[in-house]
């Protein structure tokens, strides 16, 4: 026996739909025609669309375009969708029409059928709510779908990624403060350089992430300008007066975010520059996180035959063949996430440039990568903080050993004896296996007392403190 089916109709004709499905004919056609990959439209985008449907219904009701019962039914169905309990009824692939029309209709159809269930009507009857005439009233996919991407990404940034990023920054700040007394050897070109404080090295990571958070916050502000009310091309055809302002005000009231209609609806519908900019800032953050992860795993390499300056928590066995091996797995996971996000940015940039005239037809791709990129970075930052940074320690003895053996401390002698003599001392020490002090004394270029005054790693690490 096959799956029970019901038949629904749209402007093309009849189509068989699973009997228990809350979606309708247009969603089913998309499932039939676009069986491509496994990437689905993100739930955050579906929930944002449902929220927008609620706001549009409320404004349409105030303008007399929907009655109180219709508004209430859309309100309740939209709320049910936002709980996530209906997520299985949004099965569409990212790889569909470039406008997102089929996902917009998926939401309209599910709301229609939820209302039918509540009202004792048959699924697919379009009673008491028609997907187009009532639920999509005063709307076009061309304005509500990109608006939903804006809303979903803005709320994700505000509620998830930025707070987690702040916690990560605070964790690094605690390490920077705790390790201010540790003097270590700096490294440039992966070679020994002059000393610095371990706390200062960590503070560089912290402040680079703080800059990233600042620019993400700026991008978040750009996302608050919505294309809602532009309908098909930006003119607002088939909307009541001030619809754009009233819908955005309704959305702002419900979310606590200052959503506004964009100054030029034609511009934000023809192009998605704010979304491209936000993705670019995610890439910037990914670049910073990737360099931090790489720095940490380099400083932690060992434990016996590497730098070993940082000690990482042993979260899990590292090898199926080498007993006792522990790997920097959180750094590796972070590096993979960041590499993925950098690739996502390239896709979004190309998609943003791919629009023609009044419409960009890469909307699902842009929305998917942006929302997924935010989610990946938020999850990676949380895991990195909890499973690596919290338990990361400094090997003070190993760090001090490297400082004592470093030849680059000779840099402090340069103002006193000149570059060439200082270079000769360092080369002599390295060639003959001497300490820097021994080579300096043999050179006769500086006295023992003056050497001790100049070669002070703590003073070299903080020359102006």
From Swiss-Prot:
Alphabetical GO biological process terms: fumarate metabolic process; malate metabolic process; tricarboxylic acid cycle
EC number per UniProt: 4.2.1.2
Binding site for substrate: 99-101, 127, 130-133, 140-142, 188, 320, 325-327
Record-given protein name: Fumarate hydratase class II
Keyword annotations from UniProtKB, A to Z: Cytoplasm, Lyase, Tricarboxylic acid cycle
Family matches, as InterPro entries: Fum_hydII (IPR005677), Fumarase/histidase_N (IPR024083), Fumarase_C_C (IPR018951), Fumarate_lyase_CS (IPR020557), Fumarate_lyase_fam (IPR000362), Fumarate_lyase_N (IPR022761), L-Aspartase-like (IPR008948)
CDD domains reported for this sequence: Fumarase_classII
Site annotation Important for catalytic activity: residues: 332
Subunit details: Homotetramer.
